[in-house]
């Protein structure tokens, strides 16, 4: 699964690209639900700061 690191700027680009809606707005940044994530990598491909990383 992918996780979003602290470089997240909460732009929301990743959430719009997730085909399974695994990405939601958290308190300070976006969060990926590891149980829902299908490891497609769309979030990492569109993130302007490279915050999503595969675990």
UniProtKB/Swiss-Prot annotation:
A Pfam family matched in the record: Fer4_7
Entries under InterPro entries matching the protein: 4Fe4S_Fe-S-bd (IPR017896), 4Fe4S_Fe_S_CS (IPR017900), 7Fe_ferredoxin (IPR000813), PSI_iron-sulfur_center (IPR050157)
Annotated protein name in UniProt: Ferredoxin
Ligand binding ([4Fe-4S] cluster 1): 8, 11, 14, 47
Residues annotated as domain 4Fe-4S ferredoxin-type: 2-27, 28-55
Key words, A-Z: 4Fe-4S, Electron transport, Iron, Iron-sulfur, Metal-binding, Repeat, Transport
Function: Ferredoxins are iron-sulfur proteins that transfer electrons in a wide variety of metabolic reactions.
Source species, domain of life: Bacteria
Free-text comment on the cofactor: Binds 2 [4Fe-4S] clusters.
Requisite cofactors: [4Fe-4S] cluster
UniProt-annotated binding residues for [4Fe-4S] cluster 2: 18, 37, 40, 43
GO molecular function, one term: electron transfer activity
Entries under SUPFAM superfamilies matching the protein: 4Fe-4S ferredoxins
Keyword Metal-binding part of the UniProt annotation: yes
One Gene Ontology cellular component: cytoplasm
